């Protein structure tokens, strides 16, 4: 423990640490002397006793005796008592008057509030804008009249009759979708469907000498398949020359992935 320097933990004034004689900072022992309440109380007691001593000497002196006799002749004590009594009576009378006034104000009936109607100023009338009583509004010469006609929907029975009178349609009412389209048959629905094939050429077989006759083999008829649509292949309209600038322009991404690591040594 002796090797540890505690000066870095002490309060400082600039670069100077407060240690040793400065350990009493924040206590009652301030710089310049101790602050003691007992010394203050003893000083007040000494001051009071000194005043009492001088007052007793002045009251018992000859001048004090003459002053007392003069005050007795003028009835000073009675005047002081009368003044105090009159002051107290005046204060009591003022308070009593204030209380009586408050009580009287509360007991008095409140007068009924009279509702006064506000008189509005007369409206300013523009001549010719509003027709007076007894006058009719002039009718314009070319006044348009609108006539509306309402058409009611047919009844249920009439709608059924109109629907039965219409001939059924043999064609689709909407535009067909090619993958889902089917043939719509008309009146001749029972006629069987036939597949018309082109005539096949007759095969010609050469008869070699001394050959054995070979039985004719039936040839299967080939059915024509629908033509396959060519598949569209995307091609560049303006092919650029393959250089490093076009390669950089065609690169899409966020760039080189980098990773930062902070290490403490």
Swiss-Prot record:
InterPro entries tied to this protein: McpVI
Q: Where is this region: Binds to importin alpha/beta, involved in hexon nuclear import?
A: 255-265
Q: Which UniProt keywords apply?
A: Capsid protein, Cytoplasmic inwards viral transport, Disulfide bond, Host cytoplasm, Host nucleus, Host-virus interaction, Late protein, Microtubular inwards viral transport, Phosphoprotein, Ubl conjugation, Viral capsid assembly, Viral penetration into host cytoplasm, Viral penetration via lysis of host organellar membrane, Viral release from host cell, Virion, Virus entry into host cell
**Where is the motif Nuclear export signal annotated in this sequence?**
67-76, 246-257
- Region ranges (Interaction with hexon protein): 48-74, 248-254
Cross-referenced Pfam families: MCPVI (PF02993)
Q: Which residues carry this modification: Phosphothreonine?
A: 148
Q: Where is this motif: Nuclear localization signal?
A: 136-140, 260-263
The misc remark on file is: All late proteins expressed from the major late promoter are produced by alternative splicing and alternative polyadenylation of the same gene giving rise to non-overlapping ORFs. A leader sequence is present in the N-terminus of all these mRNAs and is recognized by the viral shutoff protein to provide expression although conventional translation via ribosome scanning from the cap has been shut off in the host cell.
Domain comment in the entry = N-terminal amphipathic alpha-helix domain is essential for the membrane lytic activity. Late-budding domains (L domains) are short sequence motifs essential for viral particle release. They can occur individually or in close proximity within structural proteins. They interacts with sorting cellular proteins of the multivesicular body (MVB) pathway. Most of these proteins are class E vacuolar protein sorting factors belonging to ESCRT-I, ESCRT-II or ESCRT-III complexes. Minor capsid protein 6 contains one L domain: a PPXY motif which binds to the WW domains of HECT (homologous to E6-AP C-terminus) E3 ubiquitin ligases, like NEDD4.
In what way is this protein post-translationally modified? Ubiquitinated by Nedd4 following partial capsid disassembly; which might play a role in intracellular virus movement during entry.
The protein in question is named Pre-protein VI
Segments of this protein annotated with the region Involved in endosomal membrane lysis: 36-53
Q: Which residues does the UniProt site feature Cleavage point to? A: 33-34, 254-255
Similarity comment? Belongs to the adenoviridae protein VI family.
| Stretches for region Disordered | 123-155
Q: Which GO cellular component does the record give, naming just one?
A: host cell cytoplasm
Composition-biased stretches (Basic and acidic residues): 133-142
What inducers act on this gene? Expressed in the late phase of the viral replicative cycle.
Q: Which residues form the propeptide?
A: 1-33
Q: Name one GO biological process term.
A: lysis of host organelle involved in viral entry into host cell
**What species does this protein belong to?**
Human adenovirus A serotype 12 (HAdV-12)
